[in-house]
Amino acid sequence: MTKNLLVELGLEELPAYVVTPSEKQLGEKMAAFLGENRLSYESIQTFSTPRRLAVRVLGLADQQTDLTEDFKGPSKKIALDADGNFSKAAQGFVRGKGLTVDDIEFREVKGEEYVYVTKHEAGKSAKEVLAGIPEVLASLTFPVSMHWANNSFEYIRPVHTLIVLLGDEALELDFLGIKSGRVSRGHRFLGHEVEITNADSYEEDLRTVYVIADSKERENMIREQIKAIEAEQGVQVQIEEGLLNEVLNLVEYPTTFMGGFDTKYLDVPEDVLVTSMETHQRYFVVRDLDGRLKPNFISVRNGNAEHLENVVRGNEKVLVARLEDGEFFWREDQKLKIEDLVAKLANVTFHEKIGSLSEHMARAGVIAASLAEKAGLTAEEKAAVARAAEIYKFDLLTGMVGEFDELQGIMGEKYALLAGEDEAVATAIREHYLPDSADGALPETKVGAILALADKLDTLLSFFSVGLIPSGSNDPYALRRATQGIVRILDAFGWHIPMDELIDSLYGLSFDSLSYDNQAEVIRFIKARVDKMMGSTPKDIKEAVLSGSNFVVADMLEAAEALSEAAKTDGYKAAVESLSRAFNLAEKADTSVAVDASLFENDQEKALAQVAESLELTGSASDKLAQLFVLSPVIDAFFDNTMVMADDVAVKNNRLALLSALVAKAKTVAAFNQLNTK
């Protein structure tokens, strides 16, 4: 016989960003709990609002499955003493399993007898097992937690109610001092306390007190209400999915409405208006059917449509205050001179251990010039890079960015264009912040990409130089994100700039403001980001590529992909083993010894020498692998007919030098001795 189980935890208002992950986590933790406790079920449903997390288990068995386990103990010769009685070892073994020596039997395993006992455990009732539900709730993890009242424990928010219903029976449990029952809380303003009749009536019981427990249903309500407004008003609403996910976790009973603002604010840049609406007010942007911004917005009320006109007016008033600020800053900022703002950056601290923003920009400018040369930019592009590097942080001192910091770079581009700066320079000012997330958009222009690289490289090197290095999950200065951006940009633009050589050249620069330090740590850190970009590539292939001599990001990622594909082919194992053998011996070579053909003693040496000298790895990574793998017979023949570690020291060193010459070329693809062929 099965029943449905409902568990609801009623809390104070949760942060919107916590709600969905917590709902998912509760479902996963409940599934794991039931699985570990051998309590079968058909399926699990989860629910959430800003003030509750809930899970319903459908078709829950009324009893655990019985458990029968065999346990292997000591060998018979250890289990019995000289008189044939059970030894202390045997007695201790069965006692540890809750059994007696009467339960012992001997079974033969690989020609020797061992003690075995079989333990039978009858399944407990579902009620007994479900007494562990408070442990499930306690196991939930949150990004933040708090204490309340005089309690010693902490949780995401204070807990007010707990419901555990097995069918229509309320189980008596306790979590953080809250005793379970069947009473839930309705909407904070429209509802009241409500008794949940049984596990199946949960959503409908809450609906009577203006709570929509199913987050997907709330989402659908919002979408449908927006569609109705679009049809009625002849507009289209810009639904940002991240904003929608946030909004639906701010409301328990959504009612969508449209408000408006004076058309005069449309003279303010669209980015300012959109940021004011989406980021600051959590409103959806409204456009006409041609995509032009309308003087309207969509918002979602946490409640019903009663007195909605008052809510509309209130929201309009709040937004207009924001737009007034935006209009004021837009007007006043245009009176400022870029050069004056740049000069003031000398008084703005980048970091107390590193110096000012001006000093950071000066170093980035030197790096940018070097990168522009290495990337083969035109003279015109180099000039744009140089100018952009001189001014690219100026907008941080504008009133608009001071009020709307999300617009840094974006406003810099607009103000630069108004001041007559070249379009390439203005675009680079915006693009140097990109990517602004792990998978965010990349710069589209070469000038912007070079400036982004330079800014991120100086940030990385500067923080490492003063010992501010990320550890564990702690990365307060977002250096992992910056480095991931460096790697992604280099890959996207296909610039063949070896990172080790680049970093080495940067450490050779001299600045009055700062001396770069911790070079080896920086290289390791960058390689870790390349490793991350390789995704699910097998670990040995990652290690082989990262241990190779080619630190061109695009080449490394291509090599990892090519090796992953090659590993599926028949000839991979033999070819890799041949190359690995060469790699392992080459490590013993004296790098100062040159290959001397007069010391060759057999045709196989000569053949390998000819191959090593003529080998020019060209084309794609797959092409290079093919060129290396075809050498496998030549390498094998060499090893079959040649004693590398010969007694004659000169001959031995010559053979090691020969292998080293071959390996040096192969290592530009990967360190093949790091690959696993088992």
Swiss-Prot record:
GO terms for biological process: arginyl-tRNA aminoacylation; glycyl-tRNA aminoacylation. It is an enzyme of class 6 (ligase). It comes from Streptococcus thermophilus (strain ATCC BAA-491 / LMD-9). It catalyses: tRNA(Gly) + glycine + ATP = glycyl-tRNA(Gly) + AMP + diphosphate. The keyword Plastid does not apply. Keywords: Aminoacyl-tRNA synthetase, ATP-binding, Cytoplasm, Ligase, Nucleotide-binding, Protein biosynthesis. This is Glycine--tRNA ligase beta subunit. Disulfide bonds: none annotated. It is found in: Cytoplasm. Its EC number is 6.1.1.14. HAMAP family: Gly_tRNA_synth_beta. One of its GO terms (cellular component) is cytosol. Its main location: cytoplasm. GO terms for molecular function: arginine-tRNA ligase activity; ATP binding; glycine-tRNA ligase activity. The keyword Chaperone does not apply. Belongs to the class-II aminoacyl-tRNA synthetase family.
